[in-house]
Amino acid sequence: MMKMMRNKPTNLPTAGMTNGGRGSGGGGGGGGRESGGRDLEIRPGGMLVQKRNPDLDPVGPPPPPMIRVRIKYGAVYHEINISPQASFGELKKMLTGPTGIHHQDQKLMYKDKERDSKAFLDVSGVKDKSKMVLIEDPLSQEKRFLEMRKIAKTEKASKAISDISLEVDRLGGRVSAFEMVTKKGGKIAEKDLVTVIELLMNELIKLDAIVAEGDVKLQRKMQVKRVQNYVETLDALKVKNSMANGQQKQSSTAQRLAPIQEHNNEERQEQKPIQSLMDMPIQYKEKKQEIEEEPRNSGEGPFVLDSSAKWETFDHHPVTPLSSTTAKNNAIPPRFNWEFFD
């Protein structure tokens, strides 16, 4: 096939000589051209065809001539040059500049009928120098204002949700860091956990205050679920942290009380149990203390001897030694075996 494709251009002068009666010199000078003087080209299938010139090929039928229409708005006439194949919507957009009315707030009346923006001029019978009337539509204007407010509200809600999402992402990073610390056996300050929970709850309040519809509502719902999941995770970490702190306090308290308990156990072992009231010794220590602590002079002030006082004499009796009385007081009474009767 490649050999055939290469050989075909070499045989062109011969074909030209047979068709046009020219010699080989004329064929060589033509450089692969036909008698008409047009270039030839080989298609991918190997067919030799005449080369096309895109500049000479007709694109389509010529466009129709422009028409001029007159539009009355109030007491003023506006002349607009436009193609008859254009639509009334395109004509309204062209009237926005001269009249200052938004194209959605315009009504075009042609032959006492309101024309739809999608209708074409030539189909509706509009010709050159046709007349129309432009009327401002208050209902359309109100609808457009409501739509603009709705769009602005949606954009504002979307921006607010986007800002909240960034803040939730930042707080989510802290929650992940807390989880890693807990998994490694570390401890987290309860103050830090409470602070992050409060920040997440603030973001949740902001999300609840946003009123949205459609896709923005779905975005808000997704962010609410994220915040709730983070709060639940922090609550679980808070419980684990409090349990760990409680166990640590119990262990430290047990370590402090261990020597005290050992001392109490030793004292209990040293004490002997009292089986009956008869085994309990009678104590005379209190009586002895009262006797010894009683002062000789119970009066107030220093003792003064009066020389004029009359003294009465008594018979002398032998004084019992103090040691014997003290010994008697300190002596423990004998124990008796008492017999009880019903």
Swiss-Prot record:
Any one Gene Ontology cellular component term annotated for this protein: nucleus
Functional description taken from the UniProt entry: Co-chaperone that regulates diverse cellular pathways, such as programmed cell death and stress responses.
Gene Ontology biological-process entries: cytoplasm protein quality control by the ubiquitin-proteasome system
Domain Ubiquitin-like: 65-141
UniProt region (Disordered), positions on chain: 1-41
Domain (BAG): residue spans on this chain: 160-238
Source organism of the structure: Arabidopsis thaliana (Mouse-ear cress)
Subunit description: Binds to the ATPase domain of HSP70/HSC70 chaperones.
Phosphoserine modifications at: 298
Name the UniProt record assigns to this protein: BAG family molecular chaperone regulator 1
Record-linked Pfam families: BAG
PANTHER family according to UniProt: BAG FAMILY MOLECULAR CHAPERONE REGULATOR 1 (PTHR12329:SF11), BCL2-ASSOCIATED ATHANOGENE (PTHR12329)
PROSITE patterns: BAG, UBIQUITIN_2
Keywords: Chaperone, Phosphoprotein
Gly residues biased stretches: 18-34
Keyword presence, Transcription: no
Single GO MF annotation: protein-folding chaperone binding
Biased composition annotated in UniProt, kind: Polar residues: 8-17
